[in-house]
Amino acid sequence: MGKMGNSFYKYYQPNKKDLKDECGDCSIRALTKYFGVEWLDIFDGLVKYSRITQFMPNNLTNIQKYLDDKCVPYVKCYNPKARHKTTVLDFAKAHKEGKYIIYCRVGYGTHLVCLDNGVYYDTWDCGDRIVYGYWGGIG
């Protein structure tokens, strides 16, 4: 269970070297949970795209190419004119089955988190962040 009794959040840290949760590797964390593989496997997979784009491995461009090559569909869901904007917690409550990689924002930065059967896995509770889109929906 997550902090403050939030049953939709669960702490998740697959990076064995990041003992203080300071690495800024949310995209790699989300992908490890989504695909059920080790942190270094995802990192190595992203480096292949990084060598082409010359962006850091966890850049959103590399993530998109990685997921496109694995045929994981993306759905844009952010509408700046909408009265109610869906948060990660709202999305979790509405999607209690399947796996998703949720794209949200933290300040001016990008944040990715994996939702697995209604629970989002991360090093911190990002439930109040606005969902811009998501990949997946696999069972």
Where are the predicted features?
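Active-site nucleophile-adjacent alpha helix/oxyanion-hole segment immediately C-terminal to the catalytic cysteine
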Residues: M1-Y74
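Conserved active-site-adjacent core of cysteine acyl-enzyme catalytic domains
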Residues: Y49-G107, D116-D125, V131-Y132
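Short acidic-hydrophobic catalytic motif
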Residues: V113
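Charged phosphate-binding loop/patch that engages nucleotide di/tri-phosphates or the phosphate backbone
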Residues: G133-G139
